[in-house]
């Protein structure tokens, strides 16, 4: 079965609906993936970019961003590498008020066995349980 990845712009058209034709085509792509024997992937960087755009360009609240990310993670037609990392990261992003990218990096590191992070941005990383933050 061929694999393909979906760009951030496709996800944003579905969410923002600023171009109805593109939004419908994007939804149809997701719905028809199984029938086409096609596996669709959303790359981790696309999840990060989606969150950034929703926060910076559309002023989504943290709670609204959380709802969007959870909806993406629960979309059966999309496969996301290390999905559990994103589930923990979005929860921490809201509950502990840290940057989403920092939460993803922290949990990605922990997922891969890294327990120490060297950073000048200690504030956010210190809020991730199990991660030892150090300055270079």
Language model: regions and residue ranges:
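Short, well-structured N-terminal submotif of metal-dependent ribonuclease cores
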Residues: 1-42, 57-63, 70
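Active-site neighborhoods of divalent-metal-dependent phosphate/nucleic-acid chemistry enzymes
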Residues: 77-120
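Histidine- and aromatic-rich ligand-binding microenvironments
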Residues: 6-7, 42-43, 98-99, 121-122, ...
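Residues that scaffold the ATP/ADP-binding catalytic core of kinase and kinase-like folds
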Residues: 13-15, 53, 128
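Alpha-helix capping/helix-boundary segments
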Residues: 11, 46, 85, 104-105, ...
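Acidic, PIN/NYN-like endoribonuclease modules and their adjacent C-terminal/linker elements
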Residues: 1-3, 106-136
């Amino acid at each position: 079965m061929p694999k393909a990845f979906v760009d951030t712009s496709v996800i944003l058209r579905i969410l923002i609906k600023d171009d109805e034709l593109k939004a419908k085509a994007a939804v149809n792509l997701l719905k028809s993936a199984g029938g086409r024997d096609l596996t669709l992937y959303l790359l981790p960087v696309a999840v990060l970019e989606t969150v950034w755009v929703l926060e910076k360009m559309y002023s989504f609240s943290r709670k609204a961003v959380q709802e969007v990310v959870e909806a993406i993670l629960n979309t059966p037609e999309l496969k996301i590498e290390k999905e559990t990392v994103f589930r923990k990261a979005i929860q921490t992003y809201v509950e502990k008020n840290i940057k989403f990218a920092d939460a993803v990096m922290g949990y990605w590191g922990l997922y891969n066995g890294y327990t120490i992070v060297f950073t000048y941005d200690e504030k956010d990383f210190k809020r991730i349980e199990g991660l030892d933050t150090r300055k270079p």
